[in-house]
């Protein structure tokens, strides 16, 4: 594959005529041209055009091993200089072509380089410069592509010398007392001669400038994009050309956007093009460009969503704070739905893009990503509610696909010991480069600890709930009231995310599935691939109807001490009593009367050979309960639901339970001890 290089526009803050005067001494720069001679020189219509053909030798900037194979120390170049002086259209074209007909290697390598100097279209006191180059190696021991990439990489390391050379000779002219060269103007002779030769020769058009004054010069790169290598600059220019004809419906991406997608695909132009095209199509279909002006935050989200923008970090990145541990995930999903939470996330991402541009202007340096601080104080097993995790994975997929490289740093503070479970589930779906930006602070004092968050956020900007002096987002752990939970399906198709193509997680060995959390991630992933869960009760929760006085007992035999039993259920109709029991005996599910318990037999006595480990709690209609319990010993655990005899009608509920392996919790069980008074919080 032919390797291409295209430079951004370099700006010389000198008039075109002065730059050309310095350019005439170009061949005196011995570090670039070893020796040469003029073999042909012609002039057309006076000074309007001058063509100079030159043989020269240029050092072959390649690895030593390649030079040994090629048996060449220098490249013989055929250089063609074309100097146009035509009215106001001043252009110098320089063409380099590798040529050595008596060497067999010349038939296997093709090198072409073209440089252009031209007057700045908007400022006559400045001169523009750009260059292109191609390298094509054929039949080179089967490693042509690798050699081409190596050669182009070596070439780009020398491109910056071009500007230094011209600067050197302009300064040399100044030392000689030449600080001004008369401007070339249209005189009668040149005009008449030009008119006679117009049918034969047409000066090349000036290269068009980028729209919106976004000309990609060195100053623009330093101010808005940051430090880039010449090869990265070239990739950026080439990608821009693929999207330079924007429309009102499909606006041309700015350089910051192009650079983000290039970084996300390791500067592969083809991969970045495909990713960006899909994202632009998605933005058009979902009207993302108008989301900042049209989106209205639901009242429930404004009141109960614990997140918001908060100043900047020490690097100037906009800082967003999310108190995930205080969030009632189930309540929010049931009140506004999964689609609305996705739209909220996209609105936050669009705000982040706007704030990054403002920060760039405010701090006078490139700011092309933002910082996220996530407070996990209060995180418990209730956050592992399966539909909630599924919604989170969908949000991650959408953001990773359409907002790459916007996350500069993620600060995870006050992470409890249950956090590794959630991290195991979601990290599989986060890009590896993004995962490397996560920093974890597990202790309660994450502010003053060694390498604490003071290293990343100014002390006067640290929130008060972390020990700082800045008041922000004071959200106690609170469940949404019944009045706002409308039992909305947590997953729907009104917001189309089909453009987000989910790729399978990295392959794992069979031993990896000893982590139940990883298995959860896989099952959620492939459930999403197959269309997802249309409703949080479908295929996951089981329904139970209980008459007044009737019991339903779920027997769970445990052979894995220190494993964790989790449950989640929702009462749909009438009051229900719930409790958890344990016995060391192994009990089989029997066909006993539904109005009696397995512990009603003569072989069982409470406190002797079985005990109640979760006290009975009354659950009212439309209440949801999540809980967990460490199964410290083997035996049988019993989840029991009962419709009180005093009820005037049958009770209905939906339930789900899961056992998490002890392999994930060794030495980390304290945070999982749950009762209804602490970690097993009710979510309404």
Curated annotation (Swiss-Prot):
SMART domains: CRAL_TRIO_N, SEC14. GO terms for cellular component: cytoplasm; mitochondrion. Residues 297-474 form the CRAL-TRIO domain. The keyword Mitochondrion applies. Transmembrane segments: none annotated. The keyword Chaperone does not apply. It comes from the Eukaryota. Residues 2-178 form the PRELI/MSF1 domain. It is found in: Mitochondrion. PROSITE patterns: CRAL_TRIO (PS50191), PRELI_MSF1 (PS50904). It holds the Pfam family CRAL_TRIO_N. Residues 537-684 form the GOLD domain. InterPro entries: CRAL-TRIO_dom, CRAL-TRIO_dom_sf, CRAL/TRIO_N_dom, CRAL/TRIO_N_dom_sf, GOLD_dom_sf, PRELI/MSF1_dom, SEC14/CRAL-TRIO_domain. Keywords: Mitochondrion. This is Protein real-time. It comes from Anopheles gambiae (African malaria mosquito). The lineage of its organism: Eukaryota, Metazoa, Ecdysozoa, Arthropoda, Hexapoda. The gene is retm.
């Amino acid at each position: 594959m032919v390797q291409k290089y295209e430079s951004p526009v370099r700006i010389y803050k000198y008039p075109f005529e002065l730059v050309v005067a310095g350019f005439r001494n170009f061949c005196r720069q011995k570090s670039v041209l070893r020796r040469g001679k003029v073999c042909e020189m012609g002039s057309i219509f006076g000074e309007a055009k001058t063509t100079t053909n030159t043989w020269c030798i240029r050092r072959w900037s390649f690895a030593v091993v390649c030079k040994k194979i090629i048996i060449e120390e220098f490249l013989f170049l055929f250089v063609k200089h074309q100097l146009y002086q035509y009215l106001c259209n001043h252009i110098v074209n320089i063409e380099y072509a590798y040529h050595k007909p008596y060497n067999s290697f010349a038939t296997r390598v093709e090198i072409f380089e073209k440089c252009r100097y031209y007057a700045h279209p908007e400022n006559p006191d400045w001169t523009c410069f750009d260059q292109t180059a191609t390298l094509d190696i054929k039949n080179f021991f089967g490693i042509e592509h690798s050699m081409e990439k190596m050669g182009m990489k070596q070439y780009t390391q020398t491109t910056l010398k071009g500007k230094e050379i011209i600067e050197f000779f302009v300064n040399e002219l100044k030392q000689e007392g030449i600080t001004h060269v008369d401007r070339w103007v249209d005189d009668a002779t040149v005009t008449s001669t030009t008119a006679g030769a117009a049918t034969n020769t047409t000066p090349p058009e000036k290269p068009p400038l980028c729209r919106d004054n976004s000309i990609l010069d060195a100053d623009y790169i330093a101010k808005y994009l940051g430090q880039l290598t010449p090869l990265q600059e070239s990739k950026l220019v080439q990608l821009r050309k693929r999207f330079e004809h924007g429309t009102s419906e499909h606006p041309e991406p700015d350089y910051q956007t192009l650079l983000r997608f290039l970084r996300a695909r390791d500067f592969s132009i083809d991969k970045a093009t495909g990713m960006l095209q899909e994202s632009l199509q998605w933005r058009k279909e979902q009207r993302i460009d108008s989301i900042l002006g049209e989106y209205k935050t639901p009242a429930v989200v404004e009141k109960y969503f614990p997140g918001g923008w908060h100043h900047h970090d020490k690097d100037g990145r906009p800082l967003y704070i999310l108190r995930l541990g205080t969030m009632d995930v189930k309540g929010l999903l049931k009140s506004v739905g999964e689609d609305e939470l996705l739209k909220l996330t996209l609105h936050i991402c669009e705000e982040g893009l706007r704030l990054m541009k403002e920060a760039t202007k405010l701090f006078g340096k490139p700011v092309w990503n933002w910082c996220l601080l996530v407070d996990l104080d209060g995180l418990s097993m209730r956050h592992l509610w399966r539909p909630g995790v599924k919604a989170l994975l969908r949000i991650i997929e959408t953001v990773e696909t359409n907002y790459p490289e916007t996350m500069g740093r993620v600060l995870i503070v006050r992470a409890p010991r249950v956090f590794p479970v959630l991290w195991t589930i979601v990290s599989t779906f986060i890009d590896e480069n993004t995962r490397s930006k996560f920093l974890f602070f597990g202790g309660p004092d994450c502010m003053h600890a060694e390498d604490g968050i003071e290293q990343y956020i100014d002390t006067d900007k640290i929130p008060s709930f972390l020990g700082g002096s800045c008041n922000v987002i004071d959200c106690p752990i609170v469940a949404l009231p019944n009045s706002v939970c409308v039992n909305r399906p947590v997953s729907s198709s009104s917001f189309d995310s089909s453009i987000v193509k989910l790729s399978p997680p990295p392959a794992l060995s069979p031993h990896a599935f000893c982590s139940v959390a990883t298995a959860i991630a896989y099952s959620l992933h492939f459930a999403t691939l197959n269309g997802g869960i249309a409703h949080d009760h479908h295929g996951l929760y089981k329904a139970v109807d209980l008459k007044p006085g009737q019991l339903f007992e779920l027997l769970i035999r445990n052979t894995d001490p220190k494993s964790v039993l989790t449950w989640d259920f929702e009462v749909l109709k009438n009051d229900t009593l719930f409790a958890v029991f344990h016995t060391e005996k192994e009990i089989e599910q029997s066909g006993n009367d539904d109005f009696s318990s397995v512990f009603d037999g003569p072989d069982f006595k409470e406190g002797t050979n079985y005990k109640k480990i979760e006290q009975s709690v009354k659950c009212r209609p439309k209440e949801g309960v999540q809980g967990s319990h460490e199964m410290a010993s083997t035996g049988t655990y019993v989840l029991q639901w009962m419709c009180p005899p005093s009820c005037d009608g049958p009770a209905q509920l939906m339930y789900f339970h899961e056992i998490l392996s002890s392999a994930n919790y060794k030495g980390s069980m304290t945070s999982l001890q749950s009762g209804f008074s602490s970690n097993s919080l009710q979510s309404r």
